[in-house]
């Protein structure tokens, strides 16, 4: 799309109210360091909708085996890979951040009252103080019903000084891993879950697997 090919940044303000002009000026002039993240995924075109990060897995090879064209559509109604233009959780800043390390509190958890804990160290490698939103996603690796490929379960915005490091603690109660089974019962199924830590849904920096008993 033209905007991504020709613009270094794209300012999204939604409904900013009567101070919208002042807030936009502060960001564009550098008086404020932006730190917002998208709460939706932006499609490449209207033909790529719906577009969302937490879609259900499929065996159709839809994302990697596209056929069809406007002249010969075959069974497709989308003629390009339907990846998002900008993904859920994405956002720019005047600061640059590195994800240095990630440690989980344990590798096994009790389904009754367990709490998954992660400690992430983030480094600001720029000359300007900035805020980063550390995001924790979880994927159920094997479940009795279809579940999304990942779900945002925790996040935290932290101020990281220029050339400094900050440790961020995130917690997810195991009860957050529950689903409705085929009998419409809300349960936490025992099994393995992948923990994903990153700056957006498509920029995962750390992955690890935990087990729920």
Model-derived features: where do they sit?
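Short acidic, flexible loop segments centered on an aromatic residue
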Residues: 127-144, 150-152
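Hydrophobic alpha-helical segments
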Residues: 143, 158, 196-200
């Amino acid at each position: 799309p033209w905007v991504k090919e020709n613009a270094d940044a794209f300012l999204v303000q939604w409904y900013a109210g009567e101070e919208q002009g002042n807030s936009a000026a502060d960001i564009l002039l550098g008086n404020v360091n932006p730190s917002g993240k998208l709460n939706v995924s932006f499609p490449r075109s209207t033909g790529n909708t719906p577009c969302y990060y937490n879609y259900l897995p499929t065996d159709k090879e839809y994302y990697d085996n596209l056929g069809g064209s406007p002249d010969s559509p075959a069974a497709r109604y989308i003629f390009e890979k339907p990846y998002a233009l900008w993904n859920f959780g994405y956002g720019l800043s005047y600061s640059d951040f590195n994800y240095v390390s990630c440690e989980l509190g344990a590798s096994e958890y009790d389904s009754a009252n367990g709490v998954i804990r992660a400690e992430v160290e983030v480094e600001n490698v720029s000359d300007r103080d900035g805020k980063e939103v550390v995001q924790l996603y979880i994927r159920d690796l094997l479940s009795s019903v279809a579940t999304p490929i990942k779900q945002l379960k925790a996040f935290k915005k932290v101020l990281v000084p220029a050339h400094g490091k900050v440790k961020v603690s995130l917690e997810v109660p195991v009860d957050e891993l529950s689903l409705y089974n085929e009998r419409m019962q809300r349960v936490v199924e025992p099994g393995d879950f992948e923990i994903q830590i990153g700056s957006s849904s498509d920029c995962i920096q750390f992955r690890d697997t935990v087990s729920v008993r």
